[in-house]
Curated annotation (Swiss-Prot):
Gene name linked to the record: B3gat2
Organism: Mus musculus (Mouse)
Record's function text: Involved in the biosynthesis of L2/HNK-1 carbohydrate epitope on both glycolipids and glycoproteins.
Protein name (record): Galactosylgalactosylxylosylprotein 3-beta-glucuronosyltransferase 2
CDD domains on file: GlcAT-I (cd00218)
Cytoplasmic side: 1-2
Membrane-spanning ranges: 3-23
């Protein structure tokens, strides 16, 4: 009985397989196209002899590549004019605090070079160490003010500003000057970052208002039809340029084209150094008003309160010498 069932099963098995294959084949499915180009090249092998697939081309990809090849290359952005900030400084209890505040501002300005000039015969360790950690392109200069000029009623920082001007001229003496702008940044001033955007486009000499100066909330150039026509100031309106040292910037090319333009000690009256300097390089008609036609204050002539050190010990000092 078992042998009869097995014989019948093996007789029917081939026919069952044929029926299954016929049902699985879809007569509407297109036959695969044969190509003479293999997907794998027998000669393209990688490490260990493994086959490396060749990249297949397609009309869409070829068209995209042609579009990319024909697309013009983007030109590099023009280099920003360098802003040179000349800062006179002198030793006092708040010196490092003032310089720290100023450095925190300058660090946020692109393409700025800080020229720091000390009023002393040698570089101080405090300022040298400070600049080494400041993270700013800088030049550290020093020149002492002669004793006879250290009077309360005489202008300050004349020698230091002139040292910064001399360094700029010497640096660009034997090379073509790159676009640049110079301004005088006292270490106790406060600056809005917007001011640096304004001054960077200076063509010759640009001007703007200054806050908290001259016994007023602000001083500014008076502008009409885009030209400076006068001065809003609390002291000597008859000055040719009744402006604070923090209220103007000069193109580097103008500085180099006028090598004799400096701040003068002799023949310059108190409070007239700005006017005497600007008279050597420009005229009022050529001034370029910034800060919305000189209607916005972007720099303040702030002054740090005099430090009270009455309780500082003279004999029983701290065992640790901390720099302040």
């Amino acid at each position: 009985m078992k042998s009869a069932l097995c014989s019948r099963f093996f007789i029917l098995l081939p026919w069952i397989l044929i029926v299954i294959i016929m049902l699985d084949v879809d007569p509407r499915r297109p036959a695969p196209q044969l190509t003479s180009r293999p997907y794998f090249s027998p000669h393209a092998v990688g490490c260990g002899g493994s086959r490396v697939p060749l990249r297949r081309s397609s009309p869409g990809r070829d068209a995209a590549e042609k579009r990319n090849e024909s697309r013009p290359q983007l030109q590099p952005e023009p280099r920003l004019p360098t802003i040179y900030a000349i800062t006179p400084t002198y030793s006092r209890p708040v010196q490092k605090a003032e310089l720290t505040r100023l450095a925190n501002t300058f660090r946020q300005v692109a393409q700025l070079h800080w020229i720091l000039v000390e009023d002393r015969a040698t570089r101080s360790e405090l300022v040298s160490s400070f600049l080494a950690r400041a993270g700013l392109p800088n030049t550290h200069l020093h020149v002492p003010t002669p004793r006879r000029y250290k009077r309360p009623w005489l202008p300050r920082a004349t020698e230091q500003r002139n040292a910064g001007l001399a360094w700029l001229r010497q640096r660009h003496q034997h090379q073509s000057a790159q676009p640049g702008v110079l301004f005088f940044a006292d270490d106790d001033n406060t600056y809005s970052l917007e001011l640096f955007q304004e001054m960077r486009t200076t063509r010759k000499v640009s001007v703007w208002p200054v806050g908290l100066v001259g016994g007023r909330r602000y001083e500014r150039p008076l502008v009409k039809n885009g030209k400076v026509v006068g001065w809003y100031t609390g002291w000597r309106e008859d000055r040719p340029f009744a402006i604070d040292m923090a209220g103007f910037a000069v193109s580097l090319q103008v500085i180099l084209s006028n090598p004799k333009a400096v701040f003068k000690r002799r023949g310059s009256q108190p409070g007239m150094q700005e006017s005497d300097f600007l008279k050597q390089i420009t005229t009022v008609e050529e001034l370029e008003p910034k800060a919305s036609n000189c209607t916005k204050v972007l720099v303040w002539h702030t002054r740090t309160e005099k430090v009270n050190l009455a309780n500082e010990p003279k004999y029983h000092l701290d065992t640790v010498n901390i720099e302040v």
